C-alpha cells in the first residue's frame, strides 16, 4: 500500500470509502464539501469516478475519515502523484492531471 510522509498508513482506506466520500461530495456539491472538510480545490490531480471529476486530495482525506473515524486536514498529507493521487491510483481509481485533463503520468 502507498504511504505518505505524515499519515503512517493508508491501509484502512478501501475503494468503498472513496466511493462514500464521492457520494457525500455529490450530495453537498463541491463548494460545501470542501468547506465542510477544510480543503481547497485540487491544483494538480483529479479523481475520475463514474465520468465525474473530484478533488483528489479532499476525497482521500474524507475517505480516510470514513475508514478510521479520524479526520485529516489538507496539511496532514500531500496531494501529489506520490501522495493522494498515488494512493487513489493504487486503489484502482483513475487520476487525471488537471492541467491537461488527461490521465496522470
Task: Indicate residue ranges for each PLM-predicted region.
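Intrinsically disordered, charged low-complexity linkers and terminal tails
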Residues: 1-105
Amino acid at each position: 500500500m502507498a504511504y505518505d510522509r505524515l499519515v503512517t498508513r493508508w491501509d484502512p482506506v478501501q475503494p468503498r470509502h472513496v466511493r462514500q466520500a464521492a457520494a457525500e461530495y455529490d450530495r453537498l456539491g463541491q463548494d460545501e464539501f470542501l468547506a465542510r472538510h477544510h480543503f481547497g480545490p485540487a491544483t494538480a490531480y483529479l479523481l475520475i469516478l463514474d465520468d465525474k471529476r473530484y478533488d483528489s486530495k479532499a476525497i482521500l482525506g474524507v475517505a480516510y475519515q470514513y475508514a478510521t473515524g479520524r479526520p485529516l486536514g489538507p496539511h496532514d498529507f500531500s496531494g501529489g502523484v506520490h501522495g493522494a493521487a498515488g494512493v487513489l491510483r493504487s486503489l484502482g481509481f483513475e487520476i487525471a492531471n488537471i492541467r491537461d485533463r488527461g490521465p496522470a503520468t
